[in-house]
Structure formats: C-alpha cells, structure tokens
Amino acid sequence: MEESMEEEEMLTYEAMMDDQNHNNWEAAVDSFRQPPPAPPLPPPPPPRPSSSIPDPGRELPGGQLLAVHAGSMDRKGLKEGLPMGSPPLSEPNGVIMMLKSCDAAAAVAKAAPAPTPSSTININTSTSKFLMNVITIEDYKSTYWPKLDGAIDQLLTQSPGDYIPISYEQIYSCVYKCVCQQHSEQMYSDLIKKITSHLERVSKELQASPPDLYIERFNIALGQYMGALQSIVPLFIYMNKFYIETKLNRDLKDDLIKLFTEHVAEKHIYSLMQWVQMAPTLFSKFIPNILPPAVESELSEYAAQDQKLQRELIQNGFTRGDQSRKRAGDELAYNSPSACASSRGYR
C-alpha cells in the first residue's frame, strides 16, 4: 500500500514538472513571437489562506507551483488541486502592443511637417518646359517656314559660284524639328508650291525672251535650277527620308526634276521646233524623233555618225563609263548592224 502511494506521488510530481516545463517553453516562444511586453502590471493580490487551489482565471508561474507543492499542499491537495486540461489563456499583450504602435505611428504622422508645394512647382515647371518644345502649326507658319522660304529663294536665284549668306545648319535644324513635330506633310506641300511658283515665273520669262536669246536663256535656267537642287535636296534630306520615301514611296530629287519638266521643258519644247528644222543633226543628239525613220541601206552611215559623236563627247570630257560592267550579250548587240538601226529608231 505504501509502495503504491509512493508511486502515485512520483507520477503526480512528474506531471507537475511536465506542466511547468511546458509553460516555460510556451513563454519562451511567445517572447520571440511577440513585441516587447507592456509595462508591468500591479502585483496580484496574495493568495487566500483558506484555499490552496490556484485561481483558474490566471496562470501561476512554474516557481509558484513548486512553492505550493513544497510547502502548503499535501498529497491529497496535490492530487485534487492541480487543474487538468490545457493551461488558461494568457493576457493578450500582442493586441495591446499593436494598438500602442498604431497610436505611435499616428503621433509621428501628426508631428511630421506638411509637404511643401515645391514638388508640385517642379512638376509644373518640367511640364511647361516640355510644352515649350512643342511646335504648333501657328509656330511653323510664323517662325519656321519663313526661314526656309527665304533660304529657298536665295538658292533658286543664285548664279553659279555666288556666295549665299545663309546658315545651312540653321535650315537643317528647322527641317529636323518640323519633321519631329509631325509637320512633314505641310512642309512638303509648301516646298512644292514654292518651287512650282518659281518655275512658273521662269517659264514666263522664257516666253518673253527674243528668239535669238531663247536657247541661251533656257540653258541658263536649266543649269541654275539643277545647281539649286544640289543644295535644296540635302537640306530636306530628313523629310525625304522619313516622309517622302516612307509614305509617298518617291524621292525628293525626282519630284523636283519632274516639276521642271512639267512647268518649263514641256511648255517650251514646241518653241524649239523651228530651230530644229535649221539644224536637225545637232538637235537629234538631244531630242528624240527629230530625224526621219532609219533606212536599212544607210546603216553604215548611221554607225559612222555614232562613232563620230562618241569621239566628240570624249574630247569634251564625257566618258562612256565602266565598259567592264557591260554584259557580253549587250556588247555583241552593240557591235551588230541591227544595233545601229535600233540606235536610229528615234529618227
């Protein structure tokens, strides 16, 4: 009987020690999970002497359990007084700390200085700077196109070898900005109108020329215009690259040469016909359909005339080009008698 009592006492003591270790382990884990504890609460009231059973509303530390077991509890009280089941819930220190941290954050937000309007001013300033770079259609017509118009006038009316006091860099910059601001279509239209107006004026001047000066003035007008294109086309190369070639599938130089053909050459070709009758051999070198149709019996004479023309051109500085690039079939066709007849097909 005594042995069974001793065994029961030992089992009860081990259970109490397990509860103590379990409580200490949970407290250690909570100390790592939760923020620092709140200020210490006032000490609990002393235990009532009439009862040795702990208050179930609060959890006794492990040390108090040991003290109760060692001093004031007998074996029966130890068996009956220890609470069974899960330990009571601890005080919600995490919720209290969360509320206090929220209050502290609110206090810091109130104490922080109010944002100054400098950031808003900087944003507005950068936006205004960006808007200042925008070229409206009014800006194009009042500022940019007048510069281009004046430069085109000087280029179209210059004489060979004359110095033109214009800034090519400034003109190219104007074209670049207008293309970037989506004014390519308007600028191309203005350029075509400008050059068309100039060519119409040249055509009227040629019509008013006396017959003996007509050919000479026509040659001067053609040379002056082709020389102007050598400067105008490079100035508008950005518009040509990103508008004419991509959207119109054409080339600026071809368009400007076509303008001269339509407004000057085609209008005055018939004025040259009376001169053609005076020297048909001369004009047949440059104008087709001047000579009568070729005759087979005169093929050798046609070949001799072609060879003579080639010699004259070489003497005057004209070259036949790189003959090594000619295909063998073309060379045979050129040396055959039929080639001479075909070369006179425009007679």
Swiss-Prot record:
InterPro entries: CACUL1 (IPR042652), Cullin_N (IPR001373), Cullin_repeat-like_dom_sf (IPR016159). Gene3D superfamilies: Cullin Repeats. Residues 1-11 have a biased composition (Acidic residues). GO terms for biological process: G1/S transition of mitotic cell cycle; positive regulation of cell population proliferation; positive regulation of protein kinase activity; ubiquitin-dependent protein catabolic process. It comes from the Eukaryota. One of its GO terms (molecular function) is ubiquitin protein ligase binding. Residues 34-49 have a biased composition (Pro residues). It holds the Pfam family Cullin. Keywords: Cell cycle. Residues 1-63, 320-347 are annotated as: Disordered. Cell cycle associated protein capable of promoting cell proliferation through the activation of CDK2 at the G1/S phase transition. Belongs to the cullin family. Interacts with CDK2. This is CDK2-associated and cullin domain-containing protein 1. It comes from Rattus norvegicus (Rat).
